[in-house]
């Protein structure tokens, strides 16, 4: 018996990294998964995004944990496409209990100051995409009528301004992740009458393909500004996906049944540096 037996969870950005970690962990606790990812590159994002093969691997790992999964190829920036994909998952698995809005992009290392298309892409994915995820999923939780849990993945950069270098990329990332915290607080109030809890996790840099790619690594190497430092604790360069997943598991579990409207930094002290 798991803590989440027979729950249905929607996870965006599920093809790899944190999203895959969350999907597998929830499945191991008994949840069925609607796994959403764009499975395509975005022209303005300078590193490779997840592929359909990545999403298939996530699905295989959920199935290996003994749970059902519906892989959905959808872009969180496209509300109609996201709603259609989520509905396909609902048709197969039933109404939703848990939502993890994890899809996000970053472009550390892009030093352009007036790159408006890049700024727009980051905000549209990280913030508008999280809002779209609420619109596509929360009505199902309400229909089910037994409450639920929503976790929006923000960042330690959603709580502080460290890392700002004047670039459009970093302005957009910090602004979008601060926006996710505001979205969470508003949603926690709006959905409380339906017994839906809404919280954020706020990781610092996580050892996933979003950070561990040539573009971002080279950018951080060329700009060793201490403001980009990700952690305070010694010998911790990046946190691991599993560290974030443990926080997510707690937030969506009955152990956090009275927890709503909070931010949970998983950052090895980044926000207090």
Label the predicted regions.
Residues 192, 197, 259-261:
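Short, small/polar-rich loop/turn modules that mediate ligand/substrate recognition or access, typified
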Residues 52-53, 73-85, 116, 241-243:
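The beta1-alpha1 cofactor-binding region of Rossmann-like NAD(H)/NADP(H)-dependent oxidoreductases
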Residues 151-179, 184-193, 205-206:
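Catalytic loop of short-chain dehydrogenase/reductase
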Residues 248-249, 260-273:
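Short C-terminal tail/terminal secondary-structure segment
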Residues 220-243:
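Catalytic Tyr-x(3-8)-Lys segment
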Residues 2-40:
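Canonical Rossmann dinucleotide-binding motif of NAD(H)/NADP(H)-dependent dehydrogenases/reductases
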Residues 110-111, 115-123, 229:
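Substrate-binding pocket helix/loop in short-chain dehydrogenase/reductase
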């Amino acid at each position: 018996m798991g803590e989440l037996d027979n729950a249905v969870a929607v996870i965006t950005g599920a093809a790899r990294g944190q999203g895959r970690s969350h999907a597998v962990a929830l499945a191991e606790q008994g949840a069925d998964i609607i796994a959403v990812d764009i499975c395509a590159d975005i022209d303005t994002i300078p590193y490779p995004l997840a592929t359909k093969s990545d999403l298939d691997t996530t699905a295989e790992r959920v199935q290996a944990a003994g749970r059902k999964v519906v892989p959905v190829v959808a872009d969180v920036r496209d509300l109609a496409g996201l709603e259609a994909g989520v509905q396909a998952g609902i048709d197969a698995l039933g109404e939703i209990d848990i939502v993890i809005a994890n899809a996000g992009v970053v472009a550390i290392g892009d030093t352009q100051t007036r790159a408006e298309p890049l700024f727009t892409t980051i905000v549209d994915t990280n913030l508008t995409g999280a809002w779209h995820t609420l619109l596509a999923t929360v009505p199902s939780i309400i229909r089910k009528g037994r409450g639920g849990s929503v976790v929006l993945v923000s960042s330690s950069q959603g709580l502080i301004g460290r890392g700002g270098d004047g670039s459009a990329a970093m302005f957009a990332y910090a602004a979008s992740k601060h926006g996710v915290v505001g979205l969470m607080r508003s949603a926690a109030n709006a959905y409380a009458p339906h017994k839906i809890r809404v919280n954020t996790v706020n990781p610092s840099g996580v050892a996933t393909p979003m950070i561990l790619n040539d573009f971002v690594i080279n950018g951080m190497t060329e700009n060793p500004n201490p403001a980009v430092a990700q952690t305070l604790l010694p010998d911790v360069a990046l946190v691991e996906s599993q560290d974030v997943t443990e926080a997510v598991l707690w937030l969506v579990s009955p152990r956090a049944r009275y927890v709503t409207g909070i931010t949970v930094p998983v950052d090895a002290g980044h926000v207090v540096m």
